[in-house]
Swiss-Prot record:
Part of the 30S ribosomal subunit. Contacts proteins S9 and S11. GO terms for molecular function: rRNA binding; structural constituent of ribosome; tRNA binding. The keyword Ribonucleoprotein applies. HAMAP family: Ribosomal_uS7_B (MF_00480_B). One of the primary rRNA binding proteins, it binds directly to 16S rRNA where it nucleates assembly of the head domain of the 30S subunit. Is located at the subunit interface close to the decoding center, probably blocks exit of the E-site tRNA. The gene is rpsG. Keywords: Ribonucleoprotein, Ribosomal protein, RNA-binding, rRNA-binding, tRNA-binding. InterPro entries: Ribosomal_uS7, Ribosomal_uS7_bac/org-type, Ribosomal_uS7_CS, Ribosomal_uS7_dom, Ribosomal_uS7_dom_sf. Gene3D superfamilies: Ribosomal protein S7 domain (1.10.455.10). GO terms for biological process: translation. Belongs to the universal ribosomal protein uS7 family. This is Small ribosomal subunit protein uS7.
Amino acid sequence: MPRKGPAPRRPLVADPVYNSPLVTQLVNKILLRGKRQLAETIVYEALEGCREKSGTDPVVTLKRAMDNVKPTLEVRSRRVGGATYQVPVEVRPARATTLGLRWLVTYARARREKTMVERLMNELLDASNGLGAAVKRREDTHKMAESNKAFAHYRW
């Protein structure tokens, strides 16, 4: 770590269509090989599809999906003596958002629909309704933290 401390977080610019930093983060997670225009098209079409299917504001749908996907606890490996313990720790808000978006995009890519727009749209709708693989991942993470609660005193 540098002597000056950690580098400051750069402010995230809100996207031009929905004026939401969360949508910008989602575009950045979808982005592959520098093709920002393609990533924006995928995200905007998926959000429009959410509007048509659910009849609500797509940013509200995205936020509700994120609330259902963001973890509050996770486990971190901690070596004590010769043993490695999975120690449950609370997740900082910025990391929770990053993990939630990462899981949404990962499990959207793994879906079986034909286009990425359909996959992302359906994963967002499932997550906003408390279903889907990303929500299951969060539940698994919480379950892991719960089962390792005995090692919570090893926190650092």
